[in-house]
């Protein structure tokens, strides 16, 4: 019988910080299961989850404003350790009888806090020593309000010149508050502090490991589907690929993968997917060549959001047609991951705005009447990749740069035509090949080529001709929420440009996108 990898668990209450998912990922990296819930949960929900500890996230609100989010009172009566981060510390302080005020100056960026009192949270953790021998910690602050009086039973553990209560603690109740963000890498000892809280103070064992997650997923898949047949849409992306490998391990030949070649994939990608999963791993794959159908539906359409919806709709139609040909299929597998679940929950409660329609969640054909199998729905992307490695998938496939669900459909600006896709595929392949050769591919977060539907004059031999323009795009980012354009070497860009213009007949000009996010998005459409 497999071990219960969910036995030890942390509950993270989300107050709206851009870093909240990062807190959850850091806890998972410690080998401990956690879930991320909205701050306004009920006592019954918390009791049902039965956490070993609770973390209150940061957030953009002010605890001094009427109606600002508060932690459920039960959090402080549950008898488990609680860690408040930034806003989480402020609401803890205010709700337990302390005081919070708006600060004259917002503290944002690097700070050094001085530890004044021994605490289980930071004992023997330091970056340096002060002139008086006190431990110093390099941390990342991002707050306007600050705690000006701590609740009864708490001690001041650490402070800065402008923040008198950078860390507070009630050791008896195991309540801790930090005014900085331990989850970001700028807080150099942040992961050690989280480890101290999760592993030592909450006494959680490291049960959440790739090998154990695989064993648990295989067991749960077998329990869920029994001897039934399962169908999966395999795209060759990370999520569907790892889903396919997990299901194949669990049920073998009772999995059928439908691979839809929509004509919007990268150069030779369809052949690579079929060779890897069909020939090498031995999965049952139904290959559907649907380029003409997709491009036919996209003809004449220039609007990016409309293109996304057409691509999503046609995929569902094609997949549904193929699924109906499979006899005795009872289950549909999807590569939904935990951030998809969080995002969908936020949309359902009206707490999120749709920037671009999501291509994964919500694409289930209602008329199919199949049960849903989602073996990755508890996992973050980095966990999915680690599991993929454990299952034998190649590193270079799992750690490829992100590729949008609609594929080249949103990298060809305006109307999508086969001619444009073919030119873009070849240009993009040259860019990616040169990034690898120059050892730059893994130094940028995402790189790709965009086809611009404008003609530009060029000189070839003794003649002039008007051909198409492509733009190279490369960005550096930690979380894809913000991004800087990558400062690639000029000689490298020149080499890529020369190769594209000389080797791809039909392209006469190559430009480089130097827009950051914000104001631009990473993808052009």
Swiss-Prot record:
Q: In which pathway does it act?
A: Purine metabolism; GMP biosynthesis; GMP from XMP (L-Gln route): step 1/1
Keyword match Transmembrane? no
What highest taxon heads this organism's lineage? Answer: Bacteria
| Pfam families (UniProt xref) | GATase, GMP_synt_C, NAD_synthase
Q: Where is the Glutamine amidotransferase type-1 domain?
A: 9-207
Q: Which SUPFAM superfamilies match?
A: Adenine nucleotide alpha hydrolases-like, Class I glutamine amidotransferase-like, GMP synthetase C-terminal dimerisation domain
Catalytic residues as annotated in Swiss-Prot or TrEMBL? 86 (nucleophile), 181, 183
Answer whether the UniProt record assigns the keyword Iron to this protein.
no
**Which UniProt key words apply to this protein?**
ATP-binding, Glutamine amidotransferase, GMP biosynthesis, Ligase, Nucleotide-binding, Purine biosynthesis
Which reaction(s) are listed as its catalytic activity? XMP + L-glutamine + ATP + H2O = GMP + L-glutamate + AMP + diphosphate + 2 H(+)
Q: Which residues bind ATP?
A: 235-241
- GO MF annotation list: ATP binding; GMP synthase activity
Say which enzyme class the record assigns. Answer: ligase
User: What is its biological role?
Assistant: Catalyzes the synthesis of GMP from XMP.
- Give the multimer and partner information: Homodimer.
The protein's name in its UniProt record: GMP synthase [glutamine-hydrolyzing]
Its source organism is: Pectobacterium carotovorum subsp. carotovorum (strain PC1)
